[in-house]
Amino acid sequence: MSFPLANANWHGGRGGHVGFSPVLPPRGDLALDQFKRTFALYRQYGMDYHASFAMGERHLTNVNQILYDKDDTDMTGRVDAMFRALVADSRARGYGEYRTHIEYMDLVAGTYDFNDHALRRLNQKVKAALDPNGVVAPGKSGIWPKGRPA
């Protein structure tokens, strides 16, 4: 028997978690390098490493579950800073984030910046055509209604 996300209470208190899952090429040397850099950031921010790798035919996803106590303000601050450092590290290597917490959707969407954010501009045009009043999930995945700055 398992209890989904029961490990979120790892630190005690009201447990929380934030996922971080960059996608990289399926190469062992890159996976080892990713592990070393990510593990070092966990250590730097005083967090317990809780991650794995999921392999596909043409990709490798480094699935991280950042566990914390929601009532510990010091810990929540470290988690935020660590998450931002993880995103910056992955961006610097050209790795995109698989999915992200709603709090970080704008941050992650900003990393997809090829051709002056061509993907964001396309998504915004599609959103404007399908949802001109911006009522369906405004801001989801960093896609905001027309007239609202990204």
Where would I find each of the regions flagged by the language model?
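Conserved glycine-rich FAD pyrophosphate-binding loop
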Residues: M1-A150
